[in-house]
C-alpha cells in the first residue's frame, strides 16, 4: 500500500492509501509518527499507525470534554466511544486518571 499525505484545514493532515482517503490526524501526531510521502507500507504498519492516531484523538477529545465540565469515568468513556475505539478510549481515560484530572468517585 502506498501512503501519501496532504495538508488539510488548520492543523489537519489527511492520509491516503493507494490514492483513496483513509484517515485524518493532526500535525503533531503526524510529525511524531511521520512516514515519508509515497512510502510503501504493509498492513501491520498501517494498523500500528491507526492505533497511535486513535489514541491521540482520544486524548484530545478527553481534554476537550473535560475543559467544558466534569465527567464521571463512565460518562467520559461513553462519550469517547462515539468517536474512537474501545482500547484507545480506555487508555485515554486511564491516562487522565493517572494525571489526576479524572476520578472514579465524585
Residue locations for each model-derived region?
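An alpha-helical, amphipathic repeat domain used for nucleic-acid recognition
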Residues: 1-106
